Amino acid sequence: MAVKIKLTRLGKIRNPQYRIVVADSRTRRNGRAIETIGKYHPKEEPSLIEVDSERAQYWLGVGAQPTEPVEAILKITGDWQKFKGLPGAEGTLRVKEAKPSKLELFQAALAQAENEPVGEAITPKKKKAKAEDAEAAADAPAEAAAESEAADK
């Protein structure tokens, strides 16, 4: 029985996700698999590649032939070089940077807020500004009348 290591497609229309499976070479693309040995999500940045290295080495050792896309994935993870005995068995797989936890972000924001000086609001509220303008307008005619009376005397 000819065995291949190939990709089966999962996911939505524009978001493909693949499983790396070992299957009979005559089965359909998404047909029955003998074993699932990994997954590949090409749309993530960097692409998510997980391969069970031990099982991949076993299947390559017993004669399973990888398809071209799977061979490229195995080269990235370093499993192909390990199987062939070539240098560079560590692979070129890029790992996504770990996101800081929400608790750490909150603690940093809290520490930054404590260090800032506490003061009045920079801009006054609009209601106060309107009230002050109304008072100033009411005082202006009274002051003008008082000044004109002082000038007359």
Curated annotation (Swiss-Prot):
Molecular-function annotations in GO: structural constituent of ribosome
Gene Ontology terms: biological process: translation
PROSITE patterns hit by this protein: RIBOSOMAL_S16 (PS00732)
Domain of life: Bacteria
Region (Disordered): 114-153
Keyword Transmembrane among UniProt keywords: no
TM region positions: none
Compositionally biased intervals (Low complexity): 137-153
Ribosomal protein keyword on record: yes
Gene Ontology CC annotations of this record: cytoplasm; small ribosomal subunit
Entry keywords, A to Z: Ribonucleoprotein, Ribosomal protein
HAMAP family (alphabetical): Ribosomal_bS16 (MF_00385)
Similarity field: Belongs to the bacterial ribosomal protein bS16 family.
NCBIfam families named in the record: PRK14520.1, S16
Stated name of the protein: Small ribosomal subunit protein bS16
Gene: rpsP
